[in-house]
């Protein structure tokens, strides 16, 4: 069995977790108390969901997940919410005091008090697995717990489970909608610390998701619940291949093999289609080629950047629902003829396809229409460097004046860590730039230097 353990850190992580587990339960027919009505199990023979749930002797299905936050309010909502019986009480771990949007508190002072409890709980979950495949880590870049504690935990996981994959789902601070002034600091510190510990990181930009909710779902003022449900669908699409049997199955390590050309270039851009409200879906024919084309529209991306300015290094299309390979091949052939989509010259093929016959599930009372097919595209493009450039610029503006730095130093950090992290991100931007240069151009430049 190839089990995955989900770790939800901080408020953003926990709220994404709520949306994801709600959706998983609906998809697998598991009730909020963890029971699975027996009509599903008889002769179904499909037990792939065991990658995400473990079954107790009493027939209860418990998520292989841990929720951690340094302050209790958000996780208390889970303890009293609809799904309170689903989780083992020890899987919901809370501290007493907040990380206060401060990376240093999450990583050094307060985080280190709780990290051993968390690792102990993860160890118990891991011992329960026959063949642990890896970890999915949900967090935000901007918060203190999401940035500081996540990076601490990732370092420790690398020590304890060296060879296991670690995939991140990270909320990137939105250009317009910021929840904290110090988000650029936290983001850059956490990216620097986790860069070598994470195998693949799917970034989600709140603003991009706001816009999708406004534009495609006609929600005037999207709430976090709207955002998280949409993120839930995306995470579900990415993990569907681990939880259902499909025609072309994709597992965690397979993503990395196909999406990550160099260890540091591991930030794929996620696009999901169709995001459509029930009123509209009624009147639209969403064919395979239409939803495939929609994936190449910048408007459907989860991070604001323009792939038309960058080059694709790899591209993974994960279809679910009523999809046959013939349609997919036709759709991809059409895409390849378009000139706006450029691949780097050292990666000519570039499309990997996964097909899963389980159609997407709509959450009752949710915003997304029930559709018969959907696609999630993971693409590694050099354009995502724009996102880093934006963040670095904001960091520079504040750091030039050393604004807010004393809060971090007061918690035991040194200013040198800021400079080191910033240099690492400058190197990351440079890496992206170099990857996008055509090999022919690069050779020309080198020759030019000799004379």
Curated annotation (Swiss-Prot):
PROSITE patterns named in the record: TUBULIN (PS00227)
Positions of Mg(2+) binding: 71
Catalytic residue list: 254
Keyword Acetylation: yes
GO CC terms, sorted: cytoplasm; microtubule
Pfam families cross-referenced by the UniProt entry: Tubulin, Tubulin_C
Record text on subunit structure and interactions: Dimer of alpha and beta chains. A typical microtubule is a hollow water-filled tube with an outer diameter of 25 nm and an inner diameter of 15 nM. Alpha-beta heterodimers associate head-to-tail to form protofilaments running lengthwise along the microtubule wall with the beta-tubulin subunit facing the microtubule plus end conferring a structural polarity. Microtubules usually have 13 protofilaments but different protofilament numbers can be found in some organisms and specialized cells.
PANTHER family: TUBULIN
Protein name per its UniProtKB record: Tubulin alpha-3 chain
Lineage start: Eukaryota, Metazoa, Ecdysozoa, Arthropoda, Crustacea
